[in-house]
Amino acid sequence: AVFDQSCKGVYDRSLFSKLDRVCDDCYNLYRKHYVATGCRRNCYGNLVFRQCLDDLMLVDVVDEYYVASVQMV
């Protein structure tokens, strides 16, 4: 994964990898380029990312991922 320059704040490699993995897995699920780019938009603070969490059945950790994405902004 390549670091997204739009993400501000403290760069935490493990946190970034965790968020990026959600988008990679979501892309692998749908195989649509716009899913991968949309998921990462606004430093993961978007509805596509939230939908990916739901689609990947990660709803039990949504709050954890949301807090992580806010830390990246």
From Swiss-Prot:
GO MF, one example: neuropeptide hormone activity
Q: What family is reported?
A: Belongs to the arthropod CHH/MIH/GIH/VIH hormone family.
The record's annotation in Gene3D superfamilies points to: Crustacean CHH/MIH/GIH neurohormone
Keyword Disulfide bond tagged? yes
Q: What is this protein called?
A: Crustacean hyperglycemic hormone
**The keyword Disulfide bond belongs to this UniProt entry's keyword annotation:** yes
Superkingdom of the organism of origin: Eukaryota
Q: Which subcellular locations apply to this protein? A: Secreted
Q: Which SUPFAM superfamilies match?
A: Crustacean CHH/MIH/GIH neurohormone
Q: Which residues carry this modification: Valine amide?
A: V73
Q: Report where it is expressed, by tissue.
A: Produced by the medulla terminalis X-organ in the eyestalks and transported to the sinus gland where they are stored and released.
State the species of origin. Jasus lalandii
- UniProt-listed InterPro entries: Crust_neurhormone_CS, Crust_neurohorm, Crust_neurohorm_sf, Hyperglycemic, Hyperglycemic1
